[in-house]
Amino acid sequence: GPNRSKTPLQPDTIMIYNGKVYVLDAKLYRYGYSGNPNHLPNGPDINKQITYGEYIERTKGVPSENLYNAFIMPFNREDNTFFEMGADGNPISRITDNIGNIGEAVGDWKPNPKNYERVQGIVIDTRFLMYNYIGMPDQQKRQLAEAIEKVETRAPVPRPAT
């Protein structure tokens, strides 16, 4: 067959803020509007995000405690059924902000996952995104970073059932 060149790993967006690196996958995952689990990022998406983190840690020397992963999903802040998740993994309050953390995706093949191996699910209000398309002010970068860093307060990932 014809020769094909392999494309290198290229994450959607990398945000560097306060000395930390955030690998962001921002596609139109419909979960932010539908709430349907079938509209969440799937296994290959999760694997790819974890691979990006491994690559950055290994080749760029970024310490794992300063490296995070997140799926960014659009949602409607004014009309949503999402709840912020507490450190124990239980819902605590409805998301009323422009940015919220709705959970995480992990690979069950990773015992004791590093922060970047626990891919955070972040919703961002679509109207807010449109108004901040050109550049995100530091206040919003801080808000996004804080939402992603909630991984540090979550309980350990339970072992997979066998």
Regions found by a protein language model. Give the residues of each.
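Catalytic core segments in nucleotide and nucleic-acid processing enzymes
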Residues: 1-162
